[in-house]
Amino acid sequence: MYTADSHGRVWLDEDSFLAPFGHFQKDYDFVINYLRDSSVASRTYFDGFDENVLLQLYGFYLQQGHGWIGFHKKERASFHILETASFVPLVYAVHGGISKKLWGKGSDLCANFIKWFVFEEKDGIKLEGNIFKPNPSLVAYYKRNGMTKDCEIKGRVSVDGKIHSLVIYSMSKEDYLGKPKEEVKEKKKKKRKSKKKKRS
């Protein structure tokens, strides 16, 4: 469904594309400037979790996961990081940020690519999204793109001294494909058998 061009860009529509993250210093500058926007910072940070901690985590996620920088009309407008939350089974957690330039249709185009990459390109079984600090906008974004509340871990986050839960939203491969779980398992078995035959 998605194919990168000779420059590694994955075009989402005529105005927007994703490129591998980190080839240019401006990619990192975009992330820092995005996070320092007061409206973003107020929804992101909490007790013991500041910009320095978050950037260190992003660096770790990129080392063992995947990352893209999003462009809209030749300007950086989003960043997307997939943390490998589990290697066996393969589960990814999505992180990132989307500027106002991509709100609406543009953000959904990015989400569709992320889901395709996780479930079809990498054959992952689950995509997760964490909500540490209460964030209705992020909840709405997850729901709009097919993710549902998976679980709630109480007593994990402190915001101005008030204790909140860590909430995890997720989408399974079955949800993504719109197929029963057993049918998806059977498809994976056939795929593995096909790979073994090619090797032999």
Residues covered by each model-derived region:
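Generic hydrophobic alpha-helical segments
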Residues: L57-Y58, I114
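Acyl-donor (CoA/ACP) binding surface of acyl/acetyltransferases
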Residues: M1-F30, Y34-L35, G65-S200
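Conserved GNAT-fold acetyl-CoA-binding loop/helix
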Residues: R36-L57
